[in-house]
Amino acid sequence: MTMMITTGNSFEGKVIKQYLGIVRGIVVRSPTISQGLMGGLKSIVGGKIGAYSEMCEHAREEAFQLMIEHAQALNANGIIAMRYDTGEIGQAGTEVLCYGTAVII
C-alpha cells in the first residue's frame, strides 16, 4: 500500500475518511569520535561540516521511515501535517523527531 504524505492539512482532491491520531518516529544520534574531531576542527576554521550533515540526514530519513511504520501499524494510508523537530540530548546527542497525523483516505 502506498503511503501519501504531506506537510499540508489535506490532500487535494481526496476525502479524509478517518483521523487515526499522531504518529511519530524518533531517532537519537551522536557523532563518532572521528566525526567529533573533524567537526571540532571545522568549527575552528569555519565551513560545512560534512560528517555532521550526513549524520543528520540519515537520522531524518530513519525518523521518517519510523513514522511511516507507525502509521502502517494503524492501517493508515496517509499522513498529514508532517513535520520535523530536533533537539539536543546531553552534550553529544541530537534527537530527530518526525511526526504527523495518520489518516485513512
From Swiss-Prot:
InterPro entries: UPF0145_dom_sf, UPF0145_YbjQ-like. Coiled coil: none annotated. Belongs to the UPF0145 family. This is UPF0145 protein lpg0197. It comes from Legionella pneumophila subsp. pneumophila (strain Philadelphia 1 / ATCC 33152 / DSM 7513).
